[in-house]
């Protein structure tokens, strides 16, 4: 059991305001298993998404790395519904289409590359002369009134991460991967040691608890893009857990895998800005990881791991969000929005 999973179990056993519903997890496992059977081997393939790279080479590795160091906090301050055709939330227009959330990040990077800006090159974005702050800001120019959240933090992280790759790993994520010898947990240790902004760790009831959303999703997206081969081969890939963000916990609650206290529900329904490392936030993230582990145990298939389930749930959440769909498991409940925490970790 990985450190993240051990800490998630500890949180779930001691949680006050978030609980894992084992019956709900078992029911959802049955439902997901049926979905996977009907979708077949093509389900949730990383390369099927229109904005993901279609080639499997070193340039794609650096694309993945840049996306994952910036993959955090895309929920909107101006649009509570967080979706809709007339949303004012941060958006990137690319090839005649508006993209929001994680997809706005992918669109911005692809748009810059199309314009001849080598934005995925660590040597480029580490260099303030070649790549000034104003250029990075222009890459993330919004098509709406809302600007990209935490722009200054994103620029800082790009500079710091790029310098580490240039100074220690031959200027590429590829150099970092070669040091991990096909071991996901070794890659994570290197990320935590050399890249401080991957250190997604909270203290809960006196215990240091690892969440590691972005470090783990970097492993997962590398694995998914390269389909477990070459740069994407990790012999311990099943040690990776669900990625504790703000979107998947929301759908886990909708599906009846999680239950929230009345106090936590009230805070979410008020769209309260909750501080990072608030106990309720830690409980939500830890219990989400443990809930997906329970789902995984109930599915009990060698070809399904926590990454598979997380990708499936995230895609489903975005689909339901776009359609305004509400599952029958919470039919008597108002829709609870995603947690509003401004953090560089998710």
From Swiss-Prot:
Q: Where does queuine bind?
A: 49, 243, 245, 310, 315
Question: Family, per the entry?
Answer: Belongs to the QNG1 protein family.
- Please explain the role this protein plays, according to its UniProt record: Catalyzes the hydrolysis of queuosine 5'-phosphate, releasing the nucleobase queuine (q). Is required for salvage of queuine from exogenous queuosine (Q) that is imported and then converted to queuosine 5'-phosphate intracellularly.
For this protein, the record's Pfam families field holds: Q_salvage
Q: Which domain of life is it from?
A: Eukaryota
Q: What GO terms are given for molecular function?
A: queuosine nucleosidase activity
* Name of the protein in question: Queuosine 5'-phosphate N-glycosylase/hydrolase
Where is the catalytic site? 245 (nucleophile or transition state stabilizer)
Per its record, the protein catalyses: queuosine 5'-phosphate + H2O = queuine + D-ribose 5-phosphate
The terms describing its cellular component in GO are: cytosol
Describe the inactivation phenotype: Lacks queuosine in tRNA(Asp). Supplying exogenous queuosine (Q) or queuine (q) results in q incorporation in tRNA(Asp) in the wild-type S.pombe strain, whereas the deletion mutant strain fails to utilize exogenous Q to modify its tRNA while retaining the ability to use q.
Additional facts recorded: Eukaryotes lack the canonical genes for de novo biosynthesis of queuosine (Q), present in most bacteria. Therefore, this molecule must be sourced from ingested food and/or the gut microbiota, and metabolized to its corresponding nucleobase, queuine (q), before incorporation into cytoplasmic and mitochondrial tRNAs. Incorporation of q into the anticodon of some tRNAs contributes to translational efficiency and accuracy.
């Amino acid at each position: 059991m990985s450190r993240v999973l051990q800490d998630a179990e500890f949180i779930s056993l001691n949680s006050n305001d978030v609980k894992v519903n084992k019956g709900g997890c078992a029911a959802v496992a049955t439902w997901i298993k049926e979905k996977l059977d009907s979708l077949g081997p093509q389900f949730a393939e990383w390369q099927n998404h229109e904005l993901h790279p279609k080639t499997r080479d070193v340039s794609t590795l650096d694309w993945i790395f840049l996306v994952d160091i910036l993959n955090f906090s895309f929920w909107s301050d101006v649009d509570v519904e967080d979706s809709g055709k007339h949303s004012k939330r941060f958006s990137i227009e690319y090839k005649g289409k508006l993209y929001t959330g994680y997809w706005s990040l992918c669109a911005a990077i692809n748009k810059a590359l199309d314009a001849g800006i080598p934005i995925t090159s660590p040597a480029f974005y580490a260099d303030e002369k070649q790549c000034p702050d104003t250029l990075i800001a222009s890459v993330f120019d919004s098509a709406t009134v809302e600007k990209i959240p935490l722009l200054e933090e994103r620029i800082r992280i790009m500079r710091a991460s790029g310098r580490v790759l240039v100074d220690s790993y031959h200027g590429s994520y590829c150099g970092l991967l070669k040091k991990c010898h096909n071991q996901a947990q070794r890659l994570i240790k290197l990320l935590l040691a050399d890249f401080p902004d991957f250190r997604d760790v909270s203290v809960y009831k006196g215990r240091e608890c690892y969440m590691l959303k972005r470090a783990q999703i970097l492993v997962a997206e590398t694995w998914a893009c390269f389909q477990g081969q070459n740069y994407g081969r990790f012999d311990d890939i099943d040690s990776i857990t669900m990625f504790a963000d703000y979107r998947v916990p929301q759908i886990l609650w909708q599906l009846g895998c999680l239950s929230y206290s009345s106090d936590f529900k009230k805070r979410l329904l008020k769209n309260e800005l909750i501080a990072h490392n608030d106990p309720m936030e830690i409980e939500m993230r830890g219990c989400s990881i443990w809930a997906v582990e329970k789902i995984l145990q109930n599915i009990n298939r060698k070809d399904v791991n926590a990454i598979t389930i997380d990708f499936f749930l995230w895609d489903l959440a975005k689909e339901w969000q776009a359609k305004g769909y509400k599952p029958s498991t919470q039919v008597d409940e108002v829709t609870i929005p995603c947690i509003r925490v401004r953090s560089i970790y998710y």
